[in-house]
Amino acid sequence: MNGQKDVVQVSEAWQTLSTYLPPVTADRDYWWQLTGRHVAALVEAAGYPIEKQYEALIFHYHWTVPYMGPAPKADGTPATWKSLLGLDGSPIEYSWKWNTTRSEPDVRYVTEPIGQHPGSHLDPLNQHALRELLQRFSKNMPSSDMNMSWVNHFFARLYDHDNTRYIQEAAAGSSRSTATSVQLGTEFLRRGIGFKTYFFPRKLGQVDDISISQYGASMSQLDVDETSWDARKALVEFLETNPEGKSLRPFSLAVDNVAPSQSRLKWYFHTLHTSIDSVREIMTLGGRINGIDKQLEELEDLIRVVAGLASDFPTNAEIPLPKKSDVYDQSAKDNFGELEDVLTGYLYYFDIAPGQGKLPEVKWFIPSRHYGPNDRELASALGAWMEARGRGAYNEPYMKMLHTLSAHRGLGDGKGLQTFISCLFKPSGDLDITTYLGAEAFHPGRVAKMAKPNGRSPRATLRRGDD
């Protein structure tokens, strides 16, 4: 991976579709030219069959791009709505679930669909677009593939429904009152496309995130047997009694858009604790989850690789971060406002779906955008970790894909394209490793490269019959 040059390659599927799919509007054409290339590079690098590459791109063109909002303004900043998905306000984040010795990579992305009136009295929390999109999915897809029961439940329970008061709180200085509150996950799996809905609760009069008990109340109102909540009960006990558990702060909930009996219920938390010992304590739920010593050793090694730690770095020490000016700019600080703390520390989720087991599944996230001198070196270090474990088959395709995503800048010229790296322990003993990738849609280099004298993307002036 170290010797790979910054050469951008174009996939066959992208070349074909970009030639024949008709242009629509300047805004949609901009997002298609940018993110369509990214999706094409991801699914090709992951080794998807050509028909699955076309499926992902056609889905992206017809279902995702129309909800990405206006193209950037002339100065390269978001025109109407700054999503909290990216530090710069990008409304999309990709993910690359790494191969194991027995499996191929999977590609996913998360978007924040942007409506016609985000942040206004009509739609203060920018939820209309996502709800419209889900309704359209429900009409066009088999009921076995799309179920809205839990989605509708949490929409009703995790938000207040007084738009005027949200706007009043925003006018009084609360940036959270008109900020990202829902996101849509799209999984391009080889067996088909799946969806998840992410909720970021907003309650009037609360500056901080809602409490554990408020989340608990919303879950308790689900139509499930109370005796099936073993995993949730074990987690809450850990949160209430363990020092590391007490450091965790909830900020989101996510469900699969399938029948409740098949859905995960992922509860997301943030902590400022970053020591290796704290990771061990949380991944084992304070010793409740056992038999994972080998996986913990592998995870410790991964942390040292990603964070650039020496082999003798103490396991009880907090991992140092670079200065904030090195990891995000003023626009990101303005964008996140009261949520600034979540830009550092670790994230975890716990799958506490009722009836799925006595203990939750735990996933750890490190904000990899903070670490390493640049994106190339971070990718090379992670690739070496994969290679040492017999998982290096996709290292070169991954690096080529990164070059496509970073066409606006060299991989060695900065960091932040690889936003997070996560780890989940599988019953097989494998570590599920995922790298999350930012679009950097509003990066100055990106806008300069895409811009034309008329302010439109290259396809925006072409219409049917103009040949």
Swiss-Prot record:
Disruption phenotype: Completely abolishes the production of pestalotiollide B.
Induction: The expression of the dibenzodioxocinones biosynthesis cluster is positively regulated by the transcription factor dibT.
EC number(s) per entry: 2.5.1.-
List of residues binding L-tryptophan: E93
A GO MF label: prenyltransferase activity
Pfam families, sorted: Trp_DMAT
UniProt entry tagged with the keyword Cell inner membrane: no
Pathway it works in: Secondary metabolite biosynthesis
Binding site for dimethylallyl diphosphate: R108, K196, Y198, K266, Y268, Y436
Keywords tagged on the record: Transferase
Function according to Swiss-Prot or TrEMBL: Prenyltransferase; part of the gene cluster that mediates the biosynthesis of dibenzodioxocinones such as pestalotiollide B, a novel class of inhibitors against cholesterol ester transfer protein (CEPT). The biosynthesis initiates from condensation of acetate and malonate units catalyzed by the non-reducing PKS pks8/GME11356. Pks8/GME11356 lacks a thioesterase (TE) domain, which is important to the cyclizing of the third ring of atrochrysone carboxylic acid, and the esterase GME11355 might play the role of TE and catalyzes the cyclization reaction of the C ring.
Family as reported in the entry's similarity comment: Belongs to the tryptophan dimethylallyltransferase family.
Name of the protein this chain belongs to: Prenyltransferase GME11375
Species: Pestalotiopsis microspora
